[in-house]
Amino acid sequence: VVEQNENIVRNRKMLNQTSREMWEASSKAFARLDNKVPYIISTGNHEYGYKRSENGMTHFPEYFPFERNTAWRDLCVSAIPNRNGVASLENAAFEFNEPTWGKILIITSEFAPRDEVLDWAKKLVASETYKDSKVIFMTHGYLNPGTPPKGGTIRDKEKYALSPMNVGTQIWEKLLYPSSNIRLLICGHTGNGNSKYEDNVGYRIDNNTSGKPIHQMMFNVQF
């Protein structure tokens, strides 16, 4: 969990399977934040399919609908339907005005986002409304543990049947690199499970097409 003032950004898998019991437990855990904090969730591989992204089926919009948390009401500025054509916060954008940072746009995406998700995000950040905002993009799978040159590589494949999908290198090429105002990417997903901090976090910096640095950070709190 990353905490900035009164906003909480969460990027880790909520479940380790998609059973009703898991969804109920996750929903109950977040309930203490409802109507108080505008938490933002990035869905992971275990939120889809029967256990691990065999398909795009998910209960996310059922348990986390927009009207669940009144703290989202004035902050959510855009969203598009999920893989099943259902209105959902899986792909959504939230705008904040911070005294120190100015205008911030946080975009969260489904696991292994489809082309239409990346196209939506790219057009949104380049729009007249948000072209001067500092943008944070969240997605579940993107970066491997470590830092360059030995680690911190951008993921170029995912071993899931989910389709269509874009992996880390494609997210970089299609969205991050050509966008001039995305300044930070946050992801989760990877880790070695050995309880060593350095093996369960990742970080790298690369410049976008405008020559501006994009900080890319992975952390996996389950390990």
Locate the predicted segments by residue:
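Acidic/histidine-rich helix-loop elements
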Residues: 2-20, 66, 146-164
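Active-site proximal loops enriched in glycine and acidic residues that flank catalytic Cys/His/Asp
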Residues: 140-141, 218-220
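His/acidic metal-ligating clusters that form di-metal
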Residues: 32-35, 86-90, 95, 103-204
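Active-site beta-strand/loop signature of hydrolases that rely on acidic residues for catalysis
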Residues: 1-7, 13, 44, 134-140
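Short, active-site-adjacent cap segments at secondary-structure transitions
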Residues: 2-4, 48-49, 144-145, 193
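Extended active-site neighborhood of metal-dependent phosphoesterases/phosphodiesterases
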Residues: 8-120, 129-130, 197-218
